[in-house]
Amino acid sequence: MDEELLKRAVSIVEENIDNFEFSTDEFAQKMNMSRSNLHLKLKAITGESAIDFIRKVRFKRATELLKSGRYTVTEVSSMVGFNSSSYFATCFKKYIGCLPTEYIKKVKG
């Protein structure tokens, strides 16, 4: 059951990945549960809050897109739901540990 819930949660976030207004309220609504129930379930299964779960899915996709080499950092930031590439870069560094441009250099080696 937990695995099904996680698959559904990932699918919903991926469907809304480019929507910078996608919120935990909307996420909970699409999961057919209250925001607090979603938070509790995700916390129990993954150890993450709903917002951290959304971020994890977004940054996983961002790293995939950056690795592909087909998109600029600005394009990737928009594709994963950030309306500002500078804010994306700040969050990326906080979550991944380096700036997107540094990440691209690392993966191209």
Question: Model-flagged regions — what are they?
Answer:
Residues A44-N83, K105-G109:
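Terminal helix-turn-helix DNA-binding modules in bacterial transcription factors
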Residues T90-G109:
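…primarily DNA-binding HTH/wHTH and HhH modules…
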Residues D25-M33, L38, L42, V76-N83, ...:
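Append "Primarily bacterial transcriptional regulators
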Residues V10-F22, L42, T46, T63-T72, ...:
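Basic, amphipathic alpha-helical hairpins
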